[in-house]
Amino acid sequence: MKAYFLAVVLLTLLLPTAFAQTTSPYYHKITNLQQQKGWNGYALLSPSWSICSSCSPTGSTVNWSRTPGISSPSVSGSSTRHHIGGTRPFSDILWNNHIIGNFSSQGIYDTSHTLVPNLHHFVYDVYFFAKNIGASQALEFDINQFTGGKSFIWGHECRIAGGHEWDTYDNVHKKWVSTGIPCNPVNNAWNHLIIEVARTSGNQLLFKTITLNGDTHNLSITRSPNSTSWHAVTINYQEDGNQTQAGYSIWLDRLNFTYW
């Protein structure tokens, strides 16, 4: 009996996340988001990187496309190709999807504000593929929560041409901070990325872990939020252009988003 008790205790210590997922009444997993509606693309021109309202997906300064339903390369049988190009160096394309709250693509509008304020844990799980990964300045994967007048942006950036390292975003000072953790996605192969974050009971951002191709790094970074009037949970995917704005494509597949 003692051995059984110790085994149960050990399992509980090793798997706190799984335990929280199965017991939370708010637990929900959205699968294959790369196939779903609600994605909007925005051009971010250097050097200010503010949204360009006059830019067109077919323009010369910066251009972009998003093509779902790709059978090859694919993990699930239906990946989505994201492409950027143009002539203005270091310009980026941001794709955003509103999951919960304002403009929800999932029909989860939470007008009574009973869901978003109770969510504290988020997991961004995605496979990505590139045929010329070296043309990317960086790839960005973000989880965003807006509740109680506070803006929580868990930004994660894999610098590639920019230096093969993970950065995380500082909400208050609006800047990227190096983690010292290497980021070396494999070219011509599927890469599997899992990002885990949390909003603490004291309303702080907690960057928990980054796992790339089975290699997990514990971040344990805590930061303060910014302010907002929004009420929502959203996710971002972004591709950054390099010094020549060389065109390149990234395929996303099995993009799953979990919250509780």
What are these regions (language model features)?
Residues M1-Y4:
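Positively charged n-region of N-terminal signal peptides that target proteins for export
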Residues L193, I250-F257:
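Extracellular beta-strand elements of beta-rich domains used
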Residues L15-A20:
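Sec/Tat signal peptide C-region and signal peptidase I cleavage site
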Residues V126, A189-R199, K208-I210:
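Short tryptophan-centered beta-strand motifs in secreted/extracellular beta-sheet-rich domains
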Residues L219-D253:
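Flexible glycan-contacting loops in extracellular carbohydrate-active proteins
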Residues S76-S78, H82-W166:
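Secretory/extracellular carbohydrate-interaction modules
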Residues T168-I194:
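Short, aromatic/His-centered strand-loop micro-motif at the edge of beta-sheets
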Residues N40-F90:
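Extracellular glycan-recognition surfaces and repeat-rich motifs
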